[in-house]
Amino acid sequence: MQTRILPTVLLAFSTAAFAESAFTLQFDNPSKDGGFTQNQLLSAPYGFGCSGGNASPALSWKNPPAGTKSFVLTVYDKDAPTGLGWMHWVVADIPADVRRLPAGITAQGGRLPKGALQTRTDFGTPGYGGACPPEGREHRYEFTLTALKVAKLPNITAESTPALVGFFTRANSLGEAKFTVEHRR
């Protein structure tokens, strides 16, 4: 009996130690049910039938991999009816010492950490675009923070496509932290 308990106890301690040091990303201001607030949904001017405030959520993270020199954040709707998904937000070149993005970062970059850069999304412009799935179907919005081994992604501007940012992100990745928010209307 003791020989069976010891490996289990050691596994429990090593799992707990790993969990404390794992690279994690967290949604800091969700709704009561853990999803998006009305203010974080897409606004009416986009023409998709939603009437939210289009305000970006607050996010925080901890324990990035050793050697991290910057981060890239993406918010991706893998269920968008496009055959390709839909990129809702791309923020590149987040400095390595930053551990939080505040709520309400504007499309013009207001409230964005110094040095960080929002690039084009699938809405065609830089900045956060809130959730607005077609009625009756739940969508999964994947928030991914990638730790990078470079301080700045090469050849990236505010007009860069999500695919170009994704290419250079993958080429320079040290690790990822992610979570998913499900939303339906």
Question: What feature does the model see in each segment?
Answer:
Residues 19-185:
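N-terminus-centered regions that define maturation/targeting leaders and the start
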